Amino acid sequence: MRNCDIKFVNKEITPFGGLSLFFKMLEKCHFEEHVMQSGVPLQGSNRGYKPIQLILGLFAGVWCGASCFGHLDVVRYDAALCDLLGWERGADHRAYQRYLNKFSQAVNQRVFGNLFRCFFSELKFDNYTLDFDSTVMVREGSQEGAAKGYNPKRPGRLSHHPLLAFVSDVRMIANYWLRPGNTSASTNYLSFLEDTLSKLEGKRVGLVRMDSGFFAKEILDYLEMKGLHYIIACRFNNRIKYSLTHERKWIELTDGLEISETIYQANGWEKPRRIVMVRQEIDKRPKAAGKQIKQLELFEDEEDFGKYRYSCFVTDLDLPAKIVYDSYRGRADSENRIKELKNDFSIDDFVTNNFWATEACGNFIVMAYNFMSLFRHALINSNKKKFLKTIRYELISTPAYLGKTKDKHILYLARSLKTRQSFLSIWEKLKDFSLPYDTEKS
């Protein structure tokens, strides 16, 4: 490093000038108008921050890399960014928590039902694949709803256990419900499924995919009653294990991977259903997904089933078994969405002592995710869908300051000559961007 002194300048400069692109898109989406029409709680005092400022401040903080409420002060102390957004001052991080405490279960249902319905009604896609999953969010304190439950990575620790629904075709999240940590994957599943479909009203579901946590008679009956095609991973009870280990008509798809199918009727089912079975030889495919079946007296006549990992799916599709298996494998992308929510958007780190406030914050972060996904679809020219961390480095982290002429404001950006054109191309695209947006164009 050169030997030099330091001096400070009085000009207000933001390190996040690239956020101008995202807030311009939100303007084009009439986001503020939709928020105020959704029934969000209003402030009781004239001195309180407007709800839209707190919601946009949360978006900005998460997009810039905030990983807890305390980090939202990065927006508060960025005077240039606040000026760009037309705010007199930025909100203290405790103002976000106080506002979120106004949300209750009924308010969450009303607000996010309206916002999600409005968002998806402006996107053109149909005959889509809907994925359902749950995840574990570990808690370090004694927040409301934090309890000991299913937690494979940190057994015995308190956690929440939210449900999520994903629109696979557009890489967006259709629904988010927070649940206590001591609930199973199937708790509240029917209500969650109905709520998800209501948020996507007017669009046809082509396929529903679920993991084994949703393997239940009630959900199968509901999907069939609604005429929805499905593939659901089977929970491994003894009858399923027996069917897998006593199957003889295996067809080899590739070395170490075999597939078969049969008709199965569980106790309590009014009718039999088709199940597709897959087994993968561990020695040949050591990273294969599936479960190993341990030796039991019930299966003592079997000698070699322990060398396989098994998967099993119930479906109403009449497609070949291989296509059913390949179709279900695409559900793994929902795991990538969950990882992105946790790693890039820090959804599991924004937690309050109030359960419904935490759920409301999680839903706002999901909305920030969806708008970022829309931005990637509509405005970024790339065959690869870039993660938020990459977008943060390439676009958001752009030093800038706000200037003014006689009749307008000018945002001065500090970008290298090589990267100015890519930034300008997105800015020009924004001028033509409008809703409804056809996702098939991207």
Model regions: which residues?
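Short, solvent-exposed helix-loop connector elements
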Residues: 38-46, 321-328, 344-360, 376-387, ...
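Dynamic "connector" segments at or just before major functional cores
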Residues: 1-199, 399-442
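Structural preference for beta-strand elements that scaffold enzyme active sites
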Residues: 127-131, 173, 205-209, 229-231
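Acidic, metal-coordinating catalytic cores used for nucleic-acid/nucleotide bond scission
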Residues: 208-216, 236-239
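An anionic, glycine-rich sequence signature occurring as long contiguous blocks
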Residues: 2-4, 8, 229-343, 400, ...
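Short, surface-exposed basic-aromatic patches at helix termini and helix-loop junctions that form
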Residues: 201, 220-229
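Short amphipathic alpha-helical "interface-anchor" segments enriched in bulky aromatics
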Residues: 72, 136, 258, 321-355, ...
